[in-house]
Amino acid sequence: MKADNLPYTSSDAAPIGIFDSGIGGLSVMRHIRAMLPAHPLIYLADQVHVPYGTRSLEEVRAFSFEITRFLIGKGARIIVVACNTASAAALHSLREQFPDVPFVGMEPAVKPAASQTHSGVVGVLATPATFQGELFASVVERFAQGVKILKSTCPGLVEEIEKGRAGGIKARRILKEAIQPMLEQQVDTIVLGCTHYPFALDTISEITGPDVEVIDPSPAVARQAVRVMEQFGWLKETGESEEVTIFTSSSSELLTKKISRILSETYPVYKVNWVGQTLVEEDRVD
């Protein structure tokens, strides 16, 4: 059977829609879950198109529009774009296309990094599309004057994390090649500019050592979601823990296993298919 729509009334806890190209956005979802347990969460992992970071901004924008439409159709009242690439490619356009829906996106945490660096050198690990987007350039221009910004795209890292190999030999090699040149230039603060990367935090910290601060923006994004919910009068701080519903455009069975492994939780996972440029939910036999 299909997952039921999640109808919303003013007396209910407003459902929160969250999406990413894969499991990366779960790093954001877990913080939202911890801060807003009384709100239903609807998460979509567009794993058939992962990674977004090597795709054109136009492609990512089209995916983001349709995923947003799908999540709203499932009852989401607020959309968290838990993907740096999708935020860079589509956040502004999404707000124009869906003017009645509040959006929370991922902004590279350059501002806190620039304010706390002592060496004046900040590293950013992100995807090519994130660096190409106007959002990154704008954040650097506004908040990192006088700070040296070192960038690395970590090619192949998202794929390794999606495969559950964030601590594997290949992921370690990718990260070492990205981070070692930064260390040689006295970097003392590194920003994780992709929501997949917090799942490789142990490996990153082993390479950087204790003297480098690694900034994961996920908790700040969750706090912003709380502020937006409060602003719209939708915040429900007490009540029973509401359900989490997951959708994937790839294998629901594999995603169920990944979620259990990385979050130590079990949630219902439903399959959706891209039919042309439209997402269609697949019948599921329970």
Residue ranges of model-derived segments:
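Non-catalytic structural scaffold of enzyme domains
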Residues: M1-D286
